[in-house]
Amino acid sequence: MANILKTIIENDKGEIRRLEKMADKVFKYEDQMAALTDDQLKAKTVEFKERYQNGESLDSLLYEAFAVVREGAKRVLGLFPYKVQVMGGIVLHHGDVPEMRTGEGKTLTATMPVYLNALSGKGVHVVTVNEYLSERDATEMGELYSWLGLSVGINLATKSPMEKKEAYECDITYSTNSEIGFDYLRDNMVVRAENMVQRPLNYALVDEVDSILIDEARTPLIVSGANAVETSQLYHMADHYVKSLNKDDYIIDVQSKTIGLSDSGIDRAESYFKLENLYDIENVALTHFIDNALRANYIMLLDIDYVVSEEQEILIVDQFTGRTMEGRRYSDGLHQAIEAKEGVPIQDETKTSASITYQNLFRMYKKLSGMTGTGKTEEEEFREIYNIRVIPIPTNRPVQRIDHSDLLYASIESKFKAVVEDVKARYQKGQPVLVGTVAVETSDYISKKLVAAGVPHEVLNAKNHYREAQIIMNAGQRGAVTIATNMAGRGTDIKLGEGVRELGGLCVIGTERHESRRIDNQLRGRSGRQGDPGESQFYLSLEDDLMKRFGSERLKGIFERLNMSEEAIESRMLTRQVEAAQKRVEGNNYDTRKQVLQYDDVMREQREIIYTQRYDVITADRDLAPEIQAMIKRTIGRVVDGHARAKQDEKLEAILNFAKYNLLPEDSITMEDLSGLSDKAIKEELFQRALKVYDSQVSKLRDEEAVKEFQKVLILRVVDNKWTDHIDALDQLRNAVGLRGYAQNNPVVEYQAEGFRMFNDMIGSIEFDVTRLMMKAQIHEQERPQAERHISTTATRNIAAHQASMPEDLDLSQIGRNELCPCGSGKKFKNCHGKRQ
């Protein structure tokens, strides 16, 4: 272990030496750039673009380009990037993460690689965690980019598609991570290419990269359509039942945060809902409602996991930032269960139309890099999942902050009493204090205690983050006391007021350890920026979540034996023990995220195939007849092959029924037309007849443009409909294969195999529906102005309304379970009409 650690440290040192040499080369151009007039310096951008177009690489332009940005920043912003900032910029250009402490000027560091990569004309996305930071950075740094001749756009959620398109067309686009994700998904749902807003994803520079790529890695971005099923009554019934339970009726696993009914709880459910057996297959839907009601009432906590807004809406609280996540909802019915619990209006359940996780969104960029002050603890994850290295950059000035050992108390009450006493003492001498909490509830509790102690203060949490930048900016003034949930105000520097350095600088007080060391380091890093003095102190209790999960029972005995109910234990060993517990949690969380990625990679591969083919259809300016006719041919082949083993009469009857109801006019083909033909000949006969019907159908459309439009809408509507159903099916499969793990099967392998089979089935189903709709759609010749609208609505109506029909006189007893159903649905018999037998 010691040897591995030594190797890592030596590698980091070698990398720093290499970066220093590269930074020195940038500095060699300093005098040359300083001698240029403003117009000459601005003209460098045009020169660099021409050199790039003529085959020079961005790497070869780096030294001059960085020097131009340094000189430009000095003239426009009055800021001159330090050597460490140039080093950080080089790391960013190479697609890695420079770990730079708070206050080291990450925003200015980013200007150099952003400028360099924007010269390619392919677009650079600067990604921030919220729109306030996007607007702030785009306004401040945009001044420099515009002066140097580059265009800057800001992509906000409130902008129209046209405004978004303009923002993405700029050389540099500032946006939040969520908005880029949603724009990507929406672009892959449009019917016309001109409605797409994004260009191909080229280079992303992610601010607070650990927050977005690690903390929110598993967060799926979901575009949903409303589900019409009215289920609010079931949510209320399940909630009412769950609220009637005693503690013995359910079992909670604190460590994994799972809950289930005990035997007595099951008995009560069967009595309450008047059932013979709660876990009968007919009651699967009901158990889903009960499970969600249990989680909502006994796992999900008000003011910690969510808050109730003034508009009576349930808002999720981000566990890492303490902010509410506007527009986000828990999926799978949990959000509705919480709404029932809190007695607010229950919103309709939704159906997923498209989804992607941040992990897979950002892996789609040709080049990805990011900035953080605390990335080294997650280095393995950055490397394994994103192929990114984390390189610690030295501080411009030595860190002066004093990090005190943790103080451990027996109870939460004695811990908070000590916190309030410490804050009051520091307030009285004028030293500013920032108190970090992990939950809104804790912030409110400490606030009440400080009011009682006569200490004026500001509270920054999920309930009032609109004022967060202003509150954080004042947090370093003399006598300021600020309470903040976790990393609220991240991205805004706390600058020390007059006379504060002499008082010891900003003191950061943590009220409990987070399960991630990185979040604790971020809180500490609010103090001691740019060589300022500062202090940090964490207060813990045996009743904290982290301590309860890992070994507080042993320490509890020590406190009781020594009769130390109000006193604290302070030792470096304790701090190391806590960090060891945190490492275990981080390891568990990483393993979980890695497994999620294995599942999500199945969806990613399938999504890329669908979206690529969808894009080809949208952007095609030609007749799509070859593609549609190929689908018709493959569909005929599947149906004929699906009945290859049946008796001749049964086979011909099934194929004839398929042709009548899905392919040809009903009276245009008889049994005699097919008898005596080989399977190959039957396929060819049906295909040739289908081509005539196809020609007849398209001839009803007025002109070539109408044909193209009809073809596009037809294919896209079918694909979107089937893909949406497939996403839901994959979600259900994922839940189901988890149970197979208990049968000694690897659930990921099962998911991959089953997901692949389902995808192939979906492709067959898409081609079947396109065939059926193309051949059976009621197309009427239209005047040109109405044609487009008619085409769209006809295709949509057919797709939505056309149900697979089964001839009444057909004998189903001879059809094999794995043969295609003769109704023409494209499904296997066992999954269609065979299921009803």
From Swiss-Prot:
The keyword Phosphoprotein does not apply. It is a peripheral membrane protein. Its EC number is 7.4.2.8. Zn(2+) binds at C821, C823, C832, H833. It catalyses: ATP + H2O + cellular proteinSide 1 = ADP + phosphate + cellular proteinSide 2. One of its GO terms (molecular function) is metal ion binding. Its cofactor is Zn(2+). It is found in: Cell membrane; Cytoplasm. Coiled coil: none annotated. May bind 1 zinc ion per subunit. Transmembrane segments: none annotated. Gene3D superfamilies: Helical scaffold and wing domains of SecA, P-loop containing nucleotide triphosphate hydrolases, SecA, preprotein cross-linking domain. GO terms for biological process: intracellular protein transmembrane transport; protein import; protein targeting; protein transport by the Sec complex. ATP binds at Q85, G103, E104, G105, K106, T107, D493. It holds the Pfam family SecA_PP_bind. Keywords: ATP-binding, Cell membrane, Cytoplasm, Membrane, Metal-binding, Nucleotide-binding, Protein transport, Translocase, Translocation, Transport, Zinc. NCBIfam families: PRK09200.1 (NF006630), secA (TIGR00963). Belongs to the SecA family. Monomer and homodimer. Part of the essential Sec protein translocation apparatus which comprises SecA, SecYEG and auxiliary proteins SecDF. Other proteins may also be involved. Part of the Sec protein translocase complex. Interacts with the SecYEG preprotein conducting channel. Has a central role in coupling the hydrolysis of ATP to the transfer of proteins into and across the cell membrane, serving as an ATP-driven molecular motor driving the stepwise translocation of polypeptide chains across the membrane. This is Protein translocase subunit SecA. It comes from Streptococcus pneumoniae serotype 19F (strain G54).
